[in-house]
């Protein structure tokens, strides 16, 4: 959450909405204190307010420049999408390793006979390499599906209440998106 807030603050600095240097001051002073955030959230019943209050306690007066024109959804959805993309990229690397391993095993067992199965019972003889090749092809399809899912979730939405940009210049979102490695949505949320 801190990173998304800071990217937006940096964008606001660029467009002279907030004073220059504020984002770096906030970055230096802000320390995440999970226990304190939990304490505040028990009272406020609002996770983002608890987060911002905790940061404000550490940062002081400059904290007023955080979250300007934004909603909880701007921060949480964008943050969640960054986390999903990072996690999915780890899975992609793992899938690549599985594919490499399967390819080696396919070659190794290309002449090793085994019993094929159909409807859960013995069928015609096949090679174990052929059986592994079916797994290989399925993992390739899984990789394509995961890449497609990454593209779907890789959006940054910093557009204010119900996506209207009423209190937030769309340029802020465009600038902040470059730091998140996400893309702009084709339409805003309503």
PLM regions with names:
Residues 188-190:
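Acidic, Ala/Val/Gly-enriched low-complexity intrinsically disordered segments
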Residues 1-165, 169-177:
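A helix-coil-helix interface module used to build multimeric assemblies
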Residues 180-186:
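Conserved small/polar residues in nucleotide/adenosyl-binding loops
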